[in-house]
Amino acid sequence: MSKAPAVGIDLGTTYSCVGVFQHGKVEIIANDQGNRTTPSYVAFTDTERLIGDAAKNQVAMNPTQTIFDAKRLIGRKFDDAAVQSDMKHWPFEVVSADGKPKIEVTYKDEKKTFFPEEISSMVLTKMKETAEAYLGKTVTNAVITVPAYFNDSQRQATKDAGTIAGLNVLRIINEPTAAAIAYGLDKKAVGERNVLIFDLGGGTFDVSILSIDDGIFEVKSTAGDTHLGGEDFDNRLVTHFVQEFKRKHKKDLTTNKRALRRLRTACERAKRTLSSSTQASIEIDSLFEGTDFYTSITRARFEELNADLFRSTMDPVEKALRDAKLDKSVIHDIVLVGGSTRIPKVQRLLQDLFNGKELNKSINPDEAVAYGAAVQAAILHGDKSQEVQDLLLLDVTPLSLGIETAGGVMSVLIKRNTTIPTKQTQTFTTYSDNQPGVLIQVYEGERAMTKDNNLLGKFELSGIPPAPRGVPQIEVTFDIDANGILNVTALERSTNKENKITITNDKGRLSKEDIERMVNEAEKYRNEDEKQKETIAAKNGLESYCFNMKATLDEDNLKTKISDSDRTTILDKCNETIKWLDANQLADKEEYEHRQKELEGVCNPIITKLYQGAGFPPGGMPGGPGGMPGAAGAAGAAGAGGAGPTIEEVD
């Protein structure tokens, strides 16, 4: 069997997407619901775990056990200001475990806590399975994307999530870089082109400027806001309608999580409608305390509610231009990425900023990142086709990196927006006479003083021979690999003593043991999900056997043939089973199968006797051999999602 291709996964804050490069082109893969993007949602119920559409669809009924926005927590500390402010908006519980955030849920009547990496790994597992269902092969290799603003800890945690999901992460790349690759494959241009990528997604906003020259991408600058996106526009709508509901009905629906959730779902729908229509209506039956809510909103009102947010998206564009030292007149192309770039007002503001320049919308904004990631995955996985051979990728560091020197000053070794992989060495010395050692403290950030930057890790270099201050020479080397993982080495020249650190664990990263445990747990949950599916199939099989059997008794050719006592025997047994089913919704697979055998033991001899007695040809039995209700698992197949439609309530 040929090996499966590597896939590209856009692990988004609100939605995720997976693509694969094969037969010379990228295919974005639809999930089992037929959607090309999958909500980054995981839900826990009394009986099962749901991921993706199924999780998002039941969020109104189960808000406290439905987890989303794991990307806002991944690689962060619990007391991080962003985490603390986000927690106010989440219906689920976030607790601190050794300074790291964990999400607390009740699953199968037990309290469980999960690291953000575990939740993200469940979404990644869903994307992996989506690709496997399409390719018909086991998928192990993947490129996963992250926002340009993610620091080392967040990148590392995302990589860990991939490992827990059973993926070999070939590389972590920036989302805008991935979009640029997608764009580069679409439009091969002669000479150097400067491209501005405007990525306004569900949860993050990134602006990047790249130069593309002869198939080589270079990221000139990145800017943005890790906390701006479609969800913020939804929030404004929700607030607007909550106030309207108060005015109209004198009731405050913020006291009811489920009502808020249903309103939010309707707002998201209205927002999407307003990208193509100038008006959208909202109709929610019995939203709060039996009160229906019917209203509408115009595009103009929507734009007014979000005016400041829309305008604020222009600042990072100007910052990115300043950082890249480019005038807006030399930008050749503007590329839109992220679902929120469909909003006409955002497009208009951007176009006005660039003096009416046409925007590039040729790539589906929801899929561009996964598209580029799929191409990059093919390159790294050794795809030899001409289409990808002409592409090379240069990524950059999102923040400056350096060490603390005397007086708490940040001494930068690697400037932000430096192309990676990269290696920089600088020589430092001692601050006082006969100093026996130095403490190397590694920081990331743009501020002059280290106290305002982010400490990545620290280590001691001891054993420096006694000498006056300023004499010893200590060589500090910063080495960043293609994944943005940093190695820092300090070497004392006279003794050749050295010490080093890899910036991973010191940042509250999960330990190897943790990751292994989570990999095993992920496997356990997968098995439980499988078991749950089989149980439901057995239950549905038994149910349809009962109803099919009752229907068989009413068929014209049987009505007259069957004796009243046989008829009563079957009916009683079927009704008894249906009653048992109603009372035992949570029985296990074996019980359902046992009941089915019992029922078949009663019904089959009677039905067989009838058919033989009547001399019907075997094909005349309902549906031919094996077509008897539930025989040979026919009814069970429908329950297992074979032929039977799955109906989910969308609230």
From Swiss-Prot:
A GO cellular component entry from the record: presynapse
SUPFAM superfamilies given in the database record: Actin-like ATPase domain, Heat shock protein 70kD (HSP70), C-terminal subdomain, Heat shock protein 70kD (HSP70), peptide-binding domain
CDD domains (UniProt xref): ASKHA_NBD_HSP70_HSPA1 (cd10233)
Keyword Cell division: no
Gene Ontology molecular-function annotations: ATP binding; ATP hydrolysis activity; ATP-dependent protein folding chaperone; heat shock protein binding; protein folding chaperone; protein-folding chaperone binding
Keyword Nucleus attributed: yes
Gene disruption phenotype: RNAi-mediated knockdown is lethal in larval third instar (L3) stage.
Domain of life the protein comes from: Eukaryota
Main location: cytoplasm
Keywords attached to this entry: ATP-binding, Cytoplasm, Glycoprotein, Nucleotide-binding, Nucleus, Stress response
Annotated Gly residues bias: 621-630
Disordered: annotated segments: 621-651
Carbohydrate-modified residues: 35
GO terms classed as biological process: axon guidance; axonal fasciculation; cellular response to topologically incorrect protein; chaperone cofactor-dependent protein refolding; chaperone-mediated protein folding; follicle cell of egg chamber development; late endosomal microautophagy; membrane bending
Compartment(s): Cytoplasm, Perinuclear region; Nucleus
Signal peptide start-end: none
Family classification: Belongs to the heat shock protein 70 family.
Subunit architecture: Associates with the elongator complex; this interaction is required for some functions of the elongator complex but is not required for regulation of microtubule dynamics.
Name the UniProt record assigns to this protein: Heat shock 70 kDa protein cognate 4
Organism (species): Drosophila melanogaster
Gene this protein is translated from: Hsc70-4
